[in-house]
UniProtKB/Swiss-Prot annotation:
Residues 129-352 are annotated as: Thiamine-phosphate synthase. One of its GO terms (cellular component) is cytoplasm. GO terms for biological process: thiamine biosynthetic process; thiamine diphosphate biosynthetic process. Disulfide bonds: none annotated. Keywords: Magnesium, Metal-binding, Thiamine biosynthesis, Transferase. Binds 1 Mg(2+) ion per subunit. Its EC number is 2.5.1.3. Residues 63-85 are annotated as: Disordered. 4-amino-2-methyl-5-(diphosphooxymethyl)pyrimidine binds at Q180, Y181, R182, C183, K184, N212, S251, K280. Its cofactor is Mg(2+). Belongs to the thiamine-phosphate synthase family. This is Thiamine-phosphate synthase.
Length: 352
């Protein structure tokens, strides 16, 4: 049986060092735990973090606490510019995971000879925290993307054109919060280049970038997600490939498909075509009345799509629609920025 530090000749400097790092580790774990609890609502992560804190607490012996001397600590109160660069939850989580990991490593190194039980516990928790940090940051990124999705009322779906990036940038500059890259023509090298350009633009303006159909292309450019049609791969397969932190959308064209989509691991729906559209001439329009039913049924955001223009958008909003996805209304307009502003003004007025 290993003796507790109080039963051995303990160097007070080492005891003080261990006390400080036990505090650091437990505090860092608590910051991460509270985000997992209140920000992510992931009970499994909360349980693991709380268990780690309590295990360290049981090893925080009085002999360590009695060596504490905050008033004479030459490092107390020191600041670093990096501490100010924590403007989002993911940065706070990353910083506190690093803080806890570093403290645990110190406990492991200094505890080997005087407190082997503490050293072993610190090592086990440190390795567990490496994995939990990735899980937590992915979930945090996913939460941020889903919050952006919740706030997005207008999605721009692209169509091939010579001035693609100029039109998309004009729409982003004027407030569009979500872009879906759609390109059925050309080759993969061209698509990759265009998608990379759109990724940079969406990052610049803080907008979401979704890739139509192509999971591989979305992963290649680090897009925020993928939009699937009814004939595309099952959403369960796409979700396994994308992970939980990216968005997944599904096109629907009937109330039955809307019901089915509620059972799929997706984040939003496209519903339509509301009106006749040159993009899908083979599909009969579903009309605004069916959109009202789809919106009432769905537990996820519904983007109306298909032939939507500033002229017919008011009727869509009167029927209960709250979000729209457009192609021609922006991509074929004389002024993409002005067209975006006009559509957003109508959508914003409907939500006031």
């Amino acid at each position: 049986m290993n003796p507790t530090p109080s039963e051995t000749s303990l160097d007070p400097r080492v005891a003080r060092l261990i006390d400080a790092n036990l505090d650091r580790a437990r505090e860092g774990l608590r910051v991460v735990e509270d985000w997992c609890r209140f920000g992510l609502e992931q009970q499994d992560l909360v349980v693991r973090l709380k268990d780690w804190r309590q295990r360290l607490g049981r090893l925080h012996h009085d002999s360590y606490k009695q060596a504490r001397s905050t008033s004479t600590d030459t490092g107390a109160g020191l600041k670093h510019p990096a501490q100010l660069d924590r403007h989002s939850p993911d940065r706070v989580v990353a910083a506190n995971c690093a803080r806890a990991q570093e403290a645990l490593r110190v406990l492991e190194e200094y505890g080997r000879t005087i407190d082997p039980a503490l050293a072993a516990e610190a090592a086990a928790i440190r390795y567990g925290l490496y994995d939990l940090e990735v899980t937590c940051l992915n979930a945090t990124l996913g939460a941020r993307r889903r919050n952006k999705l919740k706030d997005a009322c207008l999605c721009l779906i692209t169509t091939p054109c010579d001035d693609l990036t100029d039109r998309v940038e004009a729409a982003l500059r004027n407030g569009v919060g979500m872009v879906q890259y759609r390109c059925k023509a050309g080759n993969d090298r061209e698509r990759l280049q265009e998608a990379q350009q759109l990724r940079q633009l969406c990052n610049k303006f803080g907008a979401l970038l979704l890739i139509n159909d192509r999971v591989d292309l979305a992963l290649a450019v680090d897009a925020d997600g993928v939009h699937l049609g009814q004939e595309d791969m099952p959403s369960e397969v796409a979700r396994d490939l994308l992970g939980v932190d990216r968005l997944l959308g599904r096109s629907t064209h009937s109330i039955d498909q809307v019901h089915q989509a509620q059972q799929e691991p997706i984040d939003y729906l496209g519903f339509g075509p509301i009106h006749s559209t040159a993009v899908k001439p083979e599909r009969n329009p579903v009309g605004v009345e069916l959109l009202a039913k789809a919106t009432a049924i769905s537990q996820r955001p519904v983007f109306a799509i298909g032939g939507i223009t500033p002229a017919n958008l008011p009727a869509l909003l009167m029927a209960g629609g709250q979000r729209a996805a457009v192609i021609g209304a922006i991509m074929h307009s004389e002024d993409s920025g002005q067209a975006t502003r006009h559509l957003l003004q109508q959508l914003d007025q409907a939500t006031i």
